[in-house]
Amino acid sequence: MPWDVKFSHGLYLPQLGWWLDAHFPQKRSFVSHAHSDHTATHDEILCSAGTAALMRARLDAKRIEHVLPFGQTEQLTADCGVTLHPAGHIFGSAQCLLEHGEHGSLLYTGDFKLRRGRSAEPCATPHAELVIMETTFGRPHYVFPPTAQVLNDIATFCHETIADDGVPVLFGYSLGKSQELLCSLEESQLPVMLHPQTHKLTRVYEQFGIAFPPYREFDLATVRGHVVICPPQSRESAFVRRIPGHRTAMITGWAMDPGAIYRYQCDAAFPLSDHADYQDLLRFVEAVNPQRVLTLHGFATEFAQTLRERGLEAWAIGEDNQLELGIRSSPPQVRAGDATPSSRSSGDAGVAAPACATPLHAPDSFARFVAAADAVKATPKKLEKIAVLRDYLAALTPPDMGTAATFLTGRAFPQRDPRNLTLGWSVIKRAVLEVAGVTEADYRDAYHRFADTGDAAGAVLAQRSLRPGDATPSSRPEILGVAGVADPGPAASRPAATSAPTTCSLADMALFFERAAAARGPAAKLDLLRERLALITPDEARYLIKIITGDLRIGLKEGLVEEALAAAAGQPLEAVREAAMLCGDIAAVARAARTDTLAEIQLTVFNPLQFMLASPEPTAEAIVDRFAAQRTAEAAAIVAGVGDPGPGSSSPATADAAPALARIWLEEKYDGIRCQLHKSGGRVELYSRDLNVITEQFPDLARAALALPHDFIGDGELLAWRDGRALPFAELQKRLGRKGGDDFFLGAEIPVSISFYDLLWLDGRSLLKEPLRERRALLERLLHGDATPSSRPDGDEGVAAPALQPATLNPQLSTKFSLAPVTFAHTASDIEAAFLAARQRGNEGLMAKDPASGYTPGRRGLAWLKLKKAYATLDVVVVGVEYGHGKRRDVLSDYTFAIRDEEHDNQLLTVGKAYSGLTDVEIAQLTQHFLEHTLEVHGRYRVVVPDTVIEVAFDTIQPSSRHQSGFALRFPRIARIRTDKTPAEIDTLATCRKLAAAAGSGGIAAVGARPPPAASD
């Protein structure tokens, strides 16, 4: 007969009548170690001598103690022997090996580590048939650096802080981690002071003969020159605040997580843990050589899955054990008391929830989507990602292929679809808490680990030991057999033998998103989300919420989805990419690719396409070098017979001609809103950068466009405009909030204009592949009332001549539409002069363009470059806020902001803090938003959902260890709120590196320096 294991706030062995690390007071319990989350005031305990002594120091209560030396076997019951083995976690930590004649051997590890610590007994690996093991760091991400390296880094941090006349403060648990640090700092010869609680427990260690290097109890008067070791919970206390010049460091395995420094609000974080990392978990299983494994704590589901993939029977205790893509094992049975999906109540006005009865392994199941997404995340290799998606997508029907492709881009709907879920963070959190039955503190802890709403929700939902309809966890523990599979309960409640696990389909999830978008008000949306979360597994919930928040964070760009679609459908990649650029609907592209109708996708009016983007360059010299290198490469390719300049190409016939083509087309970069204007017959629509319709906010522009005689799609900058020049962006923002009516005085109060610089479509003809010089010529004629085709305008070396720039426009349109002025440059000095002139006119900088380039929607290539050197700016996302001072003491006006690291899953890295630049009205609006989207509170500081993009100006950028990005901005100030941008569009770590390199070489030395005054007229 196998072991019976019940799980509810600890593990219970009914065949023995003993608990293992019970969380609440019980009659009898084994206590693996003395950390507070493993102890309680039990009547009778089994533990090691070290644990017993530490418990007496921490937990003053009467109890019966069975203290067992390591390696000594005694009878726990008449027919079961017990042996304690060192776990290596902290001093006295023990594993419990049970040996029963009928049930076999069971090893419970408690918390453990294989790494040999300096203040704990080394971990043993006794053989057992069944192992119940902790898997705190059960993901491949958690492979710790060599201990010697980490300790050296900690010592360096301490030495540097003391050298700067500061006091290094190291945060580690007062029991275990602090003693490890104390021993580890001996070689660095650093004097150490201990927090009073840490000091008390260290004295207990010494009673067992453990020797430490010299240390003192904390003394504020003599603290300078010392390292202070104290528990993590003191980091926000007056104890730390009163230490002069303190610099703090968190010592934890979670330092491996992105943003750990920010999450812990410390100056540094070092990955030293008393738990086994991923590799040691695998080594432990190999050494113990069990027949089956039950996992718990941390990433239990993921590690159990890893073991199954290696051929070992393994299941996560208290969590859903859904099978991943390609796993052939039998799934766990349904638990007793579980409601079937179709019987669960709906939160939507009493209407029954969708049945979600798709077989688990059906190609269109959402579980298969989740497995494919996890497989993509698991590999850093582009070709492997594409192969995973190719195989997944190839098995789907055209409609399902379209739905999956949309979800893979992190969206519920195609980009051009105007529907919005408006499922905010507070609704998501509330739904997760209600379904999981956990506290808000549990949710915060999960968010700390992942810094991702979806991953945090998945982890919290995985903690629920019972599904809705079961008895409460406290009244009916989950019963597990030796395989870790839940006992199905009485035969009457078991599903028929022919039944198979079911899940939601892709179509089910798409219908959910449609219902959520159509639902009115947060209450209705909450009901829908709660209903859906109750129907699906934690892993499925993880990706559901990732899609809701708009970012899968699996290392997948839309370009890779396009490559996978092409491979799955057997279509040319360029055809798929062109179709995606034209229609902005990846679902439509997927369906067309599968049905061989890609050629039918054409650029059409009122279907906005993504804007062509420019790559940033920090200096004029960099722009010249970039274009020169590009032209030389093109020329060399043609001479070698491997290149084709194509229609309108500026590539020379020989490589010798390349230097003559260094003439560069320049346009001024305005501080406005990127805008597409679509006009056909009597209809006009305006679209913003994020492809939203903004016609209602600018009806005067729409009316003016009706005067144009041709149908067209134009690309330009929408500006607040008066007396022939652009007004500050703040003036334009006053128009952005007004819609739903045609204010007669609006145009006079805040006049607006569009400065056009490109023409994409004219009278049914796509111009995307035409060279820029041709598109510009047609744009000029359009605004003059004549858009008939003409021969290519003459220009020096084939470059469009300045004559393309008209002196006057159609009088009816001159106040509403203009052509972006074009100038030309040969050298970096020319570009510098043009830049200063643009700055003098109050504009942001320059755009440098290749006049032979086509228009590539949504692509950030090298045909367009932007220079914003002086008064440089970065688009960043707010991750933390604080209350201000003085008149702003009651509003959140101080903002900590971050850029993204595109090379590491777009994790957010802080780069600075700013508190000036916004109006009182804007600050008041943002205060309300941030109060509603606060993740956690640390005194005056609030961690907020990273959903607000701002543009930050600064004087220069330089390397710095102060922020997670490794860079700091000099005199940052907020230029504007970027409501037109999402966090996925903020600037990157690579951009910071380029700007810092330019600053170091003098390229941004002029940043913050005013351009010279203009010559008087």
From Swiss-Prot:
Signal peptide: none annotated. Residues 1-363 are annotated as: Unknown. DNA ligase that seals nicks in double-stranded DNA during DNA replication, DNA recombination and DNA repair. It comes from the Bacteria. GO terms for biological process: cell division; DNA biosynthetic process; DNA recombination; DNA repair; DNA replication. The gene is lig. Its cofactor is Mg(2+). Residues 364-1017 are annotated as: DNA ligase. This is Probable DNA ligase. Keywords: ATP-binding, Cell cycle, Cell division, DNA damage, DNA recombination, DNA repair, DNA replication, Ligase, Magnesium, Metal-binding, Nucleotide-binding. Gene3D superfamilies: 3.40.50.12650, DNA ligase, ATP-dependent, N-terminal domain, DNA ligase/mRNA capping enzyme, Nucleic acid-binding proteins, Ribonuclease Z/Hydroxyacylglutathione hydrolase-like. It is an enzyme of class 6 (ligase). It catalyses: ATP + (deoxyribonucleotide)n-3'-hydroxyl + 5'-phospho-(deoxyribonucleotide)m = (deoxyribonucleotide)n+m + AMP + diphosphate. One of its GO terms (molecular function) is metal ion binding.
